[in-house]
Each structure stands twice: as C-alpha cells, then as structure tokens.
Amino acid sequence: NQLGDGQNSRETLKVDWESILPIKLTENSISCMMTKEELMRKAIELSKENVANGGGPFGAVIATKEGEIIATGVNRVTASCDPTAHAEVSAIRAAATELGTFNLSGYEIYTSCEPCPMCLGAIYWARLDKMYYANNKTDAKNIGFDDSFIYDELELKPADRKLPSEVLLHNEAIKAFEEWSAKEDKVEY
C-alpha cells in the first residue's frame, strides 16, 4: 500500500488521536476518559468486588478532572490488619506513589461512601480539589459503621474525651518543632 511519493502509508499518515478521541495515550497503555457517573460506578464496583473478596463495602477512585483514573483503593482493614487501610486512604497512598507527590491538588476523589473522619482528614491533607460520594454517613451507620462518636469526641477538650490522654515531655518535644520551623529548606505540607 504505497502513496504517490513511494512511502509506506503507515509512515506517512499520522493521526493525532489524543485530539479527536476521549482517551489519553500513554507509553504503555490507553486510558479512557470517564464521566463523573462512570467514575462513581467504578468506586461502587470496587466496593462490591471487595465485599465478594471478604473486605468491607468501600471503594474509592482518584481521577483527573477530565476523567482519567490515577489510582483506586478498597477497604483493606481486615485483609492487612491495618485499621487505617480505608478505601480513601488506600487510594490516596496509591495516587501519591503513582504521581510522586503528596500534593494531589488538581485531582478529584470518588468514594462509594461519605468518608469517615480519618479519611476526610486525609482528603484535606492530600489537597484533593473535590470529593464525590454515593452512600452517606447514615447509610454507613445503618450497617454498623457509625462514626458519630468520633465527631462527638473531636468537639471535646482532650481531658474530657473517653480516650485518656496526657501530655508528656512537651519541653523536649517542642525542640523538634522549633528546629523544623527554623529550617530554611523545609518542605511544607
């Protein structure tokens, strides 16, 4: 299949697929751009798969605003014996590793359920631009995942909380804070 100039058509006809298709071409793969609903369905699908695999009913997806999935996560608390391995935290860890940064601004998270206080804190710390969720706190409470006591505890002074706490060696510990504060080449987060 030759063109008039004698060159092979594969070499001559080059198409800029990225400009005409809703996909992102990468070195090793083609990533489909998804709608917000498709991204949420992916998070829900992950939560269902996780239940089938013996895990909790939670899934999360981190994506670009254009709909490219960067990372996913499921609840791995029982599988990994890690009480912090919630779907959102797992997705944040995977995205940060994939992107090589702790700052996930410019990205959005889709989670099958409204985040618990820990995950909400992680979402803020990761600086994600927007959060979408399907099930809410009441839905989670109705199946045994009630976080209301944590929200209640956060409103109290440390001395009034159910978890006993005590300040120890503050004068020694503050030195690390002072050293970090004075450091000119620190990376703030």
PLM region spans:
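Extreme N-terminal basic, low-complexity initiation segments
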Residues: Q2-L13
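Zinc-dependent deaminase
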Residues: D16-V51, P115, A122-Y189
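Short, basic and Ser/Thr-rich N-terminal targeting/leader segments
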Residues: G54-F58, S105
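Short beta-strand scaffold segments in enzyme catalytic cores
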Residues: F58-T64
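A short acidic/small-residue loop/turn micro-motif
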Residues: R76-A79
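Helix-adjacent hinge/juxtasegments
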Residues: T84-A85, V89-A126
